[in-house]
């Protein structure tokens, strides 16, 4: 009797597998729909000369603000609309009056370790950079450039791209 029971159970299991719905023949399983990714608006930099600040906007929302130094009398930072044209790590600095060069990476390099250029007349450049003189940030001290604390310009360097809009206002 045990043999017949085992044999019958075996046949029943075989039949059950043969007649059960196959995955390929059953209703399709719906694919998970990925969550939509937010559309990231490009950054825009707004330099406020009188406030000695650069504000970082994403769309209309201010996402960051940094203290800056601006051009001193006779070397004023030009007002206008620009775009970032250069990003350089460890830039070489060339003195605008005597042509003296200070190599990139030199602790005395007035540009610090990061350069973000947004204005040129074909010979001279103006841009964001660090400084070996952090006490100058918040003043009118540069030859037209935007000096920043080294940690701030490093952070900004990582956020912006070539073509990022730069607006300089009083």
Model-derived features with residue positions:
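Cell wall/extracellular polymer interaction/catalysis modules
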Residues: 2-8, 21-91, 105, 111-115
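Bacterial N-terminal signal peptides
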Residues: 9-19
